[in-house]
């Protein structure tokens, strides 16, 4: 003879049932993430990342056996903190130059994207208008012919 489940076992079963129900239903309102456009310009690096490009080369020359990315990042961060503002100035200037180039590139990209987006629907609308106008012309001609023949018949009576 089977006995009743304990309260703890009943709760555990209820939790499992809730979890399985939740797993079966997809989330409402959530859509897949939009893919990245491969033509979009890459964001300009900050002054620190401009510094990192140079520092990586130096670090690899001094420590060829050390392949750890974390070690390179840690050493670069320590070195960057120890630099004075005047030492950081060339990196900041280069970063600003790259940022200006990026802003121009992204403006051109957005301009091209917006005009392409506007042109594509416009072409579709034009094609639809052409199709409708062709249909309407032939339908109008057909209707005129039919109306004329009906009127002729009415006149005869």
UniProtKB/Swiss-Prot annotation:
Cellular location(s): Nucleus
An example Gene Ontology molecular-function term: transcription cis-regulatory region binding
GO biological process, alphabetically ordered: regulation of DNA-templated transcription
DNA-binding region: 41-110
Biased composition (Basic and acidic residues): 10-27, 76-87
Keywords: DNA-binding, Nucleus, Phosphoprotein
Tissue: Expressed in all tissues examined.
Residue(s) carrying Phosphoserine: 149
Compositionally biased spans, kind Acidic residues: 124-133, 141-157
GO cellular component entries: nucleus
Name this polypeptide is given: DNA-binding protein MNB1B
Source organism (scientific name): Zea mays
């Amino acid at each position: 003879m089977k006995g009743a489940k304990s309260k703890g076992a009943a709760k555990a079963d209820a939790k499992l049932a809730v979890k399985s129900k939740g797993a079966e239903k997809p989330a409402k309102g959530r859509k897949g993430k939009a893919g990245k456009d491969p033509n979009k310009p890459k964001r300009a690096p900050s002054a620190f990342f401009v510094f990192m490009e140079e520092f990586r080369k130096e670090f690899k020359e001094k420590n060829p056996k050390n392949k750890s990315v974390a070690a390179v990042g840690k050493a670069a961060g320590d070195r960057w903190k120890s630099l004075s503002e005047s030492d950081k100035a060339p990196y900041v200037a280069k970063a600003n130059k790259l940022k200006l180039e990026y802003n121009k590139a992204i403006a051109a990209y957005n301009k091209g994207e917006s005009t392409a987006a506007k042109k594509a629907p416009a072409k579709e609308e034009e094609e639809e208008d052409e199709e409708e106008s062709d249909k309407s012309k032939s339908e109008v001609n057909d209707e005129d012919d039919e109306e004329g023949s009906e009127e002729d018949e009415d006149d005869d009576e």
